[in-house]
Amino acid sequence: MILVDDDVEPVAKRRLRVGYLHVPLILSYEADTPAGAWGQLVVIALAEFLGMTLWFSATAVTPALSRELQMSATEASWLTMAVQGGFVVGTLLAAFVNLADLVQGRRLVCAGAVSGAIANAAVLVAPGAWPAIGLRFLTGVALAAVYPPAMKMAASWFVSRRGLALGLLIGALTLGKAVPYLMTTVFGDRWQLTLLAASGLSLLGGLLVVLLARDGPFLAPSRAFDPHAIRRLLRIRGVRLAIAGYLGHMWELYAMWTWVGVFATASFAAAGLGPSAAIAGSAAAFLAIGSGAAGCALAGYVADRMGKARVAVWALATSASCAVLTAAVFGTRPVWVFALVMLWGFTVVADSAQFSALVTEYAPPDQVGTALTFQTSIGFLLTMVTIDALPRVAGSFGWQYASLLLVPGPVAGTLAMRALVGKPGPSPL
């Protein structure tokens, strides 16, 4: 096993330890980044950006779609939860049938983007609420072939800059998830155009990745599925803590993304914006989610220099503080609400890639795929709890105080990540 000294030490000054022998790392910061790596990252990230426009395409048009299909409040909330559930099922099935060994990553991403686009567009002809929800579930299953394989492809091109690379990738898909909210500010109640536009972008992403993307030189061969692999992975302290931090992060993230537009709309209405509150709420949701792209990029850049766990602690603590402050700014001047949700959006996802990067470093190289799949699956399963619970809390206490439900997640994640700050871990080499 090759070990890398403290996670907080600059990569250029790290030393590799093999047994009791310390060998200076003579490679420069860029020396282990192969030619073409950054170009490949651009292709993969752009494909992710385009494909992930499907995720919130129905959520962004929930009011208009609910009226069209005469949905109840419970059915409307399932438009988003169905995607989460489909994604969980898809990632678990991918692990059990060993898709990563049977199909190239670029082909998986293409198949997921294309099939997801078809399922999403089919909502236009759904005869009722539950058929539409079923199609959104299938969209989530398809996206399970878009997100984790792309993450593994991107990681296969980088070693010392893996934190930045995955940060840029997560930033791209974050921006993609924000795009439907921007579409609603343009298309208004014409929800059909939002769904069709998202499906068209996803088709383009699938075509892009299958034609131009390829795996990098640091892709370790995967094992056949081992039912005991997860148990062995959880014996590794670094893997356990990285997953624990990720779960705290996911407790907050998707509930915030799903309902921040509703929170902002309610706040603007309380401030007296009247009919323009809904459009302003969609704009706030786009800016809140979209600002996360910059957060991911900055966090990735800093993480490779100051440590992934340390950056995660900062992001988790800040996002928890923002969740608390939502109660204070509710109903105040819109500029304060916009400022807070943008800061919240910037930090709530900034650490996302670092949990994945930590897992790729602590897990054995030939079990990285299983580790990422397990981490992603249980994380997205947890999101369904808070996505469902948040509007219920709002129904009892109002949107002013609903986001306080999300605070325990990042607090718990902060404690898990503090245990990893400055600790040596396995190298991704």
Regions found by a protein language model. Give the residues of each.
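Juxtamembrane intracellular "pre-TM" segments in multi-pass secondary transporters
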Residues: 29-33, 215-243
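Extracytoplasmic gate region of multi-pass secondary transporters
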Residues: 58-59, 239-289, 293
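Paired small-residue
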Residues: 130-138, 336-343
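Cytoplasmic helix-loop-helix junction between adjacent transmembrane helices
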Residues: 137-171
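Helix-loop-helix hairpin linking two adjacent transmembrane segments in secondary transporters
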Residues: 168-213
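A late C-terminal transmembrane helix in Major Facilitator Superfamily
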Residues: 362-395
